Amino acid sequence: MTTRLLQCRDDIFVKMELDNPGGSHKYRAAKNIIESSIISGKIIPQKTTIIEKTGGNFGLGLLAVCSRVGVDVDLAVGLSFSKYKRKILRSFGAQLIGIDLLQQGMTPREVVEYHISKQEVHGKHYFYTDQFNNKLGVEAHRIQTGSEIARQLKENHSGNDVIFIGCAGTGASFTGTCNALKDHGYNVIPILIEPDGCDSKNEIFVDHRIEGVSVGVRPPFLEWNLISETMTVSSSEFMKARQKFFSETGLLLGNSSAASMAAAYRIREEKRLQSIPIVTIAYDSGLWYDDY
């Protein structure tokens, strides 16, 4: 499906990926991985169980796809992620695995590896979607998300220059979208958003409130040579941006989406790059979160 490109004030455009099934941009990668793996025979409906470590959005995307094709989903969800998202994942059919192991200090990846090693004992036939190493995620955003933005932007704005503001967990959506815009003839100024205190390139991470971003590993699919600038955003800044966006549109953004909007607002307030449209992504809705 094609999601909206919402035009806001000051030539800021927001790709409303929260309109996807599953409620986020992660549906794109999940759909591409599952459908491609069914075609290749790596996933057999009614037999295979998907296993993945995810903080919520990719899991919801997997459920949105797998529920239609008869594939079960087992997820290792870090204990720091939204309790509400975990509740939703369970209610829509996911099995949340390894909670006791996580409480004992295992990482979600270690939980996945442990369950894969024990799959025969538990009568499982696992397929690990492995979003941090699966290039089908990047492909989904290059073919779909970025190409949609390019077509929609041409309908709303003349010129070939565009600022793209985004966050990175795996880096799949950032890299895929930027490269798609370049494929369509745009001169892209990519700006990466990080939480205050984080520097993913140099593997510096601190505790923060932007789930799914700067997650403790260098984003594997982020093409660093693409990035023109990195901006950091504080919790107070993204919360103010979320309130401002809600006042203007009536729409409630999730934390990473609000952080991207905070950067867009800051660029406009600084009166730089004024003649160039800004595109950012509403990755998911603020309704998923309970940390206001």
Feature roles, as predicted:
Residues 1-292:
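PLP-dependent amino-acid enzyme catalytic core
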